[in-house]
Curated annotation (Swiss-Prot):
Protein name stated in the entry: Bromelain inhibitor
Annotated signal peptide: 1-19
Organism: Ananas comosus (Pineapple)
Primary role: Weak inhibitor of cysteine proteinases.
Disulfide pairings: 22-42, 25-74, 27-40, 49-56, 53-65, 98-118, 101-150, 103-116, 125-132, 129-141, 174-194, 177-226, 179-192, 201-208, 205-217
Keywords: Disulfide bond, Protease inhibitor, Repeat, Signal
Propeptide: 31-35, 77-95, 107-111, 153-171, 183-187, 229-246
Family annotation (InterPro entries): Bowman-Birk_prot_inh, Bromein_sf, Prot_inh_BBI, Prot_inhib_I67_bromein
Subunit field text: Each inhibitor is composed of two chains, designated A and B linked by three disulfide bonds.
Recorded family membership: Belongs to the protease inhibitor I67 family.
């Protein structure tokens, strides 16, 4: 069994490896004596040769490699799509963070767990997350239904439109913003209730714009209009009240 097959075998049989796009590092190779420096196999082929991690750890919104297979075992570059398909064909895979996952439904007592519809444009077929977890301000998929259960690929835009039509609240890549209400002819603009836990007081977005798979606030009501910080759960309740009035 070559090292790639061994790697996939280990992943399938217990150790979960997060495979992400280049910006978050797919599989890093250690390139110096410093534990912080890696040569990363990027989804968009920025590196010459991929490496394979036995274990990956999320830290400050990025993924770092904890255990490396020797770079000498690297045979040839593999695209992100190929790598993901190999992982998916094996069994469960953790796909991506928020930019490719729509998390609208609260499914447990935890505010951080949702049913998620995955909209990963890098894979042939999106699939469906059983559970999604907020980690370092992003949402990651914890468990995927088999790709065989996927009928047809759905684009991120289609998925979002479906969520909006069903009047569900979509929590975006920006975990601090809830964007449920379409407010213009543009599919990318929404009324957003900001729940930024890093600021003293949330505030309210007049419009929100999708940019590079994340949502950014275009226009804020004065912070003076904000009375006190509210939790993500409270924000969603306020959104429901607003929806009921319109």
């Amino acid at each position: 069994m070559n090292m790639l097959l061994l790697f996939l075998h280990e992943v399938i049989n217990g150790e979960r490896v997060t495979l992400t796009a280049c910006s978050e590092c797919v599989c890093p190779l250690q390139t110096s004596s410093s534990d912080d420096e890696y040569k990363c196999y990027c989804a968009d082929t920025y590196s010459d040769c991929p490496g394979f991690c036995k274990k990956c750890k999320a830290e400050f919104g990025k993924y770092i490699c904890l255990d490396l297979i020797s770079p000498n075992d690297c045979v040839k570059p593999v695209s992100s799509s190929e790598a993901k398909q190999k992982m998916i064909k094996g069994e469960r895979v953790t796909l991506t963070a928020c930019s490719e996952c729509v998390c609208p439904l609260r499914t447990s007592s935890s505010d951080e767990e949702y049913k998620c519809y995955c909209t990963d444009t890098y894979s042939d077929c999106p699939g469906f997350c059983k559970k999604c977890k907020a980690e370092f301000g992003k949402y990651i998929c914890l468990d995927l239904i088999s790709p065989n259960d996927c009928v047809k690929p759905v684009s991120s835009l289609e998925a979002k439109q479906n969520m909006i039509k069903e009047e569900r609240v979509t929590l975006t890549a920006c975990s601090e913003c809830v964007c449920p209400l379409r407010t213009s002819s543009s599919d990318e603009e929404y009324k957003c209730y900001c729940t930024d836990t890093y600021s003293d007081c949330p505030g309210f977005c007049k419009t929100c714009k999708a940019e590079f798979g994340k949502y950014i606030c275009l226009d804020l009501i004065s912070p003076n209009d904000c009375v006190k910080p509210v939790s993500s759960w409270e924000a969603r309740q306020k959104i429901k009240l607003l929806q009921g009035r319109e």
